[in-house]
């Protein structure tokens, strides 16, 4: 019978060793990969954090690159000190029909929806691609980095404290919104209690 020697070590748990972050985009889109190649170079060769942030955002998933509406972009570009600067969005710019007048804007984005594109250009604005931006301002001077609301997706309404617990405003997953479905106990004072 062989006894374990007292000098044996304990096996180290390696499951937490890896840093979980993207080093490249999941997408196989060749145009996106060319942009990654370009901004990898710029992030390495320039001392600007702008290029590093753009590179990191190019790696992100679609849910982490939410679309930015025209109205939100106009509102953000109206803030003091942002006149004449280029709005940079690593994602899509979408139209907002609630906006009546579009000011003259200089914009750089991965994609611009057709109606948003026509409205920006009609107002005398300019739309750049990221390779044009790299030539225009390689260090990100005169730019404003914007992004859409990441928690704007409907699914975020279901996250948080369990629905039905006190002070919870979490949306329950219900098969139907009828009178008989999660509308009585806990929802009105006459039926037990009201949250």
Curated annotation (Swiss-Prot):
<keyword id="KW-0832">Ubl conjugation</keyword>
<feature type="region of interest" description="Disordered">
    <location>
        <begin position="158"/>
        <end position="195"/>
    </location>
</feature>
<feature type="modified residue" description="Phosphothreonine">
    <location>
        <position position="165"/>
    </location>
</feature>
<feature type="compositionally biased region" description="Basic residues">
    <location>
        <begin position="168"/>
        <end position="178"/>
    </location>
</feature>
<dbReference type="GO" id="GO:0022625">
    <property type="term" value="C:cytosolic large ribosomal subunit"/>
</dbReference>
<dbReference type="GO" id="GO:0003723">
    <property type="term" value="F:RNA binding"/>
</dbReference>
<dbReference type="Pfam" id="PF17135">
    <property type="entry name" value="Ribosomal_L18"/>
</dbReference>
<keyword id="KW-0597">Phosphoprotein</keyword>
<comment type="subunit">
    <text>Component of the large ribosomal subunit.</text>
</comment>
<feature type="modified residue" description="Phosphoserine">
    <location>
        <position position="137"/>
    </location>
</feature>
<dbReference type="GO" id="GO:0005791">
    <property type="term" value="C:rough endoplasmic reticulum"/>
</dbReference>
<keyword id="KW-0689">Ribosomal protein</keyword>
<keyword id="KW-0963">Cytoplasm</keyword>
<protein>
    <recommendedName>
        <fullName>Large ribosomal subunit protein eL18</fullName>
    </recommendedName>
</protein>
<feature type="cross-link" description="Glycyl lysine isopeptide (Lys-Gly) (interchain with G-Cter in SUMO2)">
    <location>
        <position position="126"/>
    </location>
</feature>
<dbReference type="InterPro" id="IPR021132">
    <property type="entry name" value="Ribosomal_eL18/eL18-A/B/_CS"/>
</dbReference>
<feature type="cross-link" description="Glycyl lysine isopeptide (Lys-Gly) (interchain with G-Cter in SUMO2)">
    <location>
        <position position="171"/>
    </location>
</feature>
<keyword id="KW-0687">Ribonucleoprotein</keyword>
<keyword id="KW-1017">Isopeptide bond</keyword>
<dbReference type="GO" id="GO:0002181">
    <property type="term" value="P:cytoplasmic translation"/>
</dbReference>
<dbReference type="InterPro" id="IPR036227">
    <property type="entry name" value="Ribosomal_uL15/eL18_sf"/>
</dbReference>
<comment type="similarity">
    <text>Belongs to the eukaryotic ribosomal protein eL18 family.</text>
</comment>
<dbReference type="InterPro" id="IPR021131">
    <property type="entry name" value="Ribosomal_uL15/eL18"/>
</dbReference>
<comment type="function">
    <text>Component of the large ribosomal subunit.</text>
</comment>
<keyword id="KW-0256">Endoplasmic reticulum</keyword>
<dbReference type="InterPro" id="IPR000039">
    <property type="entry name" value="Ribosomal_eL18"/>
</dbReference>
<dbReference type="GO" id="GO:0003735">
    <property type="term" value="F:structural constituent of ribosome"/>
</dbReference>
<feature type="compositionally biased region" description="Basic residues">
    <location>
        <begin position="185"/>
        <end position="195"/>
    </location>
</feature>
């Amino acid at each position: 019978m062989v006894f374990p020697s007292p000098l044996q070590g304990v096996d180290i748990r390696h499951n937490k060793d890896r840093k979980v972050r993207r080093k490249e985009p999941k997408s196989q889109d060749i145009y996106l990969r060319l942009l990654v190649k370009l901004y990898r170079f710029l992030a390495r060769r320039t001392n600007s954090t702008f290029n590093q942030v753009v590179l990191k955002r190019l790696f992100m998933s679609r849910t982490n690159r939410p679309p930015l509406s025209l109205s939100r972009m106009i509102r953000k570009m109206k803030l003091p000190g942002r006149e004449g600067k280029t709005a940079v969005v690593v994602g899509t710019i979408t139209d907002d029909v609630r906006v009546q007048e579009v000011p003259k804007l200089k914009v750089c984005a991965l994609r611009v929806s057709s109606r948003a594109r026509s409205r920006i250009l009609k107002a005398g604005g300019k739309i750049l691609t990221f390779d044009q931006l790299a030539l225009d301002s390689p260090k990100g001077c005169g730019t404003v980095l914007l992004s859409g609301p990441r928690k704007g997706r409907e699914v975020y309404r279901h996250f948080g404290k369990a629905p039905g617990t006190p002070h919870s405003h979490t949306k329950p997953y219900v098969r139907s919104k009828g009178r008989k479905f999660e509308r009585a106990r806990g929802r009105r004072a006459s039926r037990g209690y009201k949250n």
